[in-house]
């Protein structure tokens, strides 16, 4: 199940039934009528300056964990794309292009949205393989329409299948140890294997004579290493605890000494196996790829430490996805992932408290306004009372004069009546 604070995706329907998967966070899990329910908070617009959506309650069938991306996508492959900060939508790869950004080159993809048939451009980080979360496992949608295959009677609807059931297991080259519990994702295997086969003993290739002439000593060392790897592989099942992990390349670069002497390497020791490089990279580039991953890992640790409370939620999700990619290569990412989840939970608490503060300030402002209005009314009543006092004083003065006049009339009346004839 999904515990509170877990980043998930929630299905939402738009445009007459199109399903969009929206980044969200689980706030609370509870049971209702023997069925698990979840209160989730929408994270798609949290930092985009738009009004936050209210929390909503969904059932388990509307939730899924966050799937990971891959390094490359094929033409006509079904994918999901992150569009307009709203959520992940179904599309199809129509082409790709390398673009230079400063000194770096980045791959962009042309994707046609299945719902609108519009073709848009996305960077690689905004793409993911199209997968279905069923019965607690990921099921992969085949990357090409079956209509491309001649003589096939299958329907497109049958293209959803369990990758672990239908894909043959990936067998590494002789002598290479694949550490347990570090399986290469089936979707990635199919793509990589479609591009090239796994490297085998190089002595049978057409260029061996040239390589031996250039550097026979290196070839001898290479054959010796392969023999040693074969010996290690043959006893792997008998001695699982004593097996020494063998990398898919030989450490030749001096930068390894620098990396292993870094303080962060001692604080957060790592023993990556880099086994996916067997299918993702050429043999001559594996070591450089591994060094790049080591530097990336340490750089990501620094980015986690530098996170600010007002950073976009998408940045947190990007870090989580990056660590998930490194985990495939054997990196221990439990600590940074746990810290990111904790920070996301704190961000959610901060958001709640911010809303509570706004509500409290609004109530205070309303009360202050009522108080000011009452004070204004009091002052107005005081002014009216003062004017009334003046009018009362004038009335009393007038009444006193009238009383005096009545007395004068009375005296005159008596004097007149009693006057002699």
Swiss-Prot record:
Cellular location(s): Nucleus
Record region (Disordered): 149-229
Regions that span the bilayer: none
DUF724 domain mapped to chain residues: 246-420
Highest taxon above the source species: Eukaryota
Alphabetical keyword list: Coiled coil, Growth regulation, Nucleus, Transport
InterPro entries in alphabetical order: Agenet-like_dom, Agenet_dom_plant, DUF724
The name this protein goes by in its record: DUF724 domain-containing protein 8
Lineage: Eukaryota, Viridiplantae, Streptophyta, Embryophyta, Tracheophyta
Gene: DUF8
């Amino acid at each position: 199940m999904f515990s509170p604070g877990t980043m998930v995706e929630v299905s939402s329907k738009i445009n007459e039934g199109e399903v969009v998967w929206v980044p969200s966070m689980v706030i609370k899990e509870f049971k209702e009528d023997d069925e698990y329910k979840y209160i989730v908070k929408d994270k798609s617009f949290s930092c985009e300056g738009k009004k936050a959506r209210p929390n909503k309650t969904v059932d388990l069938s509307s939730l899924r964990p966050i799937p990971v991306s891959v390094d490359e996508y094929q033409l006509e492959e079904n994918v999901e794309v992150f569009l307009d900060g709203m959520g992940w939508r179904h599309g199809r790869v129509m082409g790709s292009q390398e673009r230079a950004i400063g000194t770096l080159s980045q791959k962009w993809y042309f994707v046609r949205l299945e719902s609108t048939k519009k073709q848009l451009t996305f960077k690689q980080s905004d793409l993911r393989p199209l997968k279905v979360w069923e019965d607690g496992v990921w099921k992969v949608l085949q990357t090409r329409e079956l209509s491309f295959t001649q003589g096939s009677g299958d329907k497109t609807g049958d293209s959803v299948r369990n990758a672990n059931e239908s894909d043959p297991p990936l067998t590494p080259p002789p002598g290479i140890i694949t550490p347990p519990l570090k399986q290469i994702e089936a979707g990635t295997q199919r793509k990589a294997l479609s591009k090239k086969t796994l490297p085998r003993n190089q002595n049978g290739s057409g260029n061996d004579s040239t390589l031996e002439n250039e550097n026979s000593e290196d070839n001898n060392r290479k054959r010796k290493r392969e023999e040693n790897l074969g010996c290690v592989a043959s006893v792997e099942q008998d001695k699982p605890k004593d097996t020494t992990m063998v990398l898919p390349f030989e450490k030749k670069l001096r930068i390894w000494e620098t990396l292993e002497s870094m303080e962060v390497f001692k604080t957060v020791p790592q023993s990556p196996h880099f086994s996916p490089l067997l299918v993702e990279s050429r043999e001559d580039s594996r070591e450089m790829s591994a060094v790049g991953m080591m530097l990336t890992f340490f750089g990501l640790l620094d980015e986690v430490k530098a996170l600010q409370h007002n950073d976009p939620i998408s940045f947190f999700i990007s870090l989580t996805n990056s660590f998930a990619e490194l985990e495939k290569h054997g990196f221990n990412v439990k600590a940074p992932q746990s810290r990111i989840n904790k920070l996301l939970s704190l961000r959610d608490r901060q958001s709640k408290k911010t809303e509570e503060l706004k509500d409290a300030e609004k109530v205070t402002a309303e009360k202050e306004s009522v108080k000011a209005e009452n004070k204004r009314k009091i002052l107005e009543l005081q002014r009216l009372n003062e004017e009334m006092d003046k009018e009362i004083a004038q009335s009393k003065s007038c009444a006193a004069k009238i009383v005096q006049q009545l007395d004068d009339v009375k005296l005159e009346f008596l004097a007149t009546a009693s006057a002699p004839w």
